[in-house]
Amino acid sequence: MRGGIGNMMKQAQKLQEELKKAQEEIAKMEVTGESGGGMVAVTINGKHEARRVSIDPSLFEDDREMVEDLVAAAFNDAVHKLEQESQQRMAGLSEGMNLPSGFKLPF
């Protein structure tokens, strides 16, 4: 029995280290979201901070509200992509751990 608890503690410690490493990797990631068929692109990092915004010059000839909407849509697309990538990386950590059904990482 004692060995089982010790192994479980080692496994939990290893998971904690892997989780920390994955979070650090995610924080360094950059993803780009697009809208308007690529006419607007927003790049964010893993901390959801905007790093770059690119707007096709032809959009400045159109109305301002449309450009604002496209920037917001591109930012939201980038956030969605970051969340998907984060979930995929975290899912790999829980494989083979016999976690209860519905139990997800991070804690």
Swiss-Prot record:
Q: Which domain of life is it from?
A: Bacteria
Entry's localization field = Cytoplasm, Nucleoid
Question: InterPro entries annotated for this entry?
Answer: YbaB-like_sf, YbaB/EbfC
The UniProt GO MF terms for this protein read: DNA binding
Give me the disulphide-bonded residues. Answer: none
**Keywords, ordered alphabetically:** Cytoplasm, DNA-binding
Report the function annotation for this chain: Binds to DNA and alters its conformation. May be involved in regulation of gene expression, nucleoid organization and DNA protection.
Oligomeric state and interaction partners are given as: Homodimer.
GO cellular component terms given for this protein? bacterial nucleoid; cytosol
Family to which this protein belongs:
Belongs to the YbaB/EbfC family.
Main site of residence?
Answer: cytoplasm
PANTHER family on file: NUCLEOID-ASSOCIATED PROTEIN YBAB
Question: This chain belongs to which protein, by name?
Answer: Nucleoid-associated protein Mlg_1509
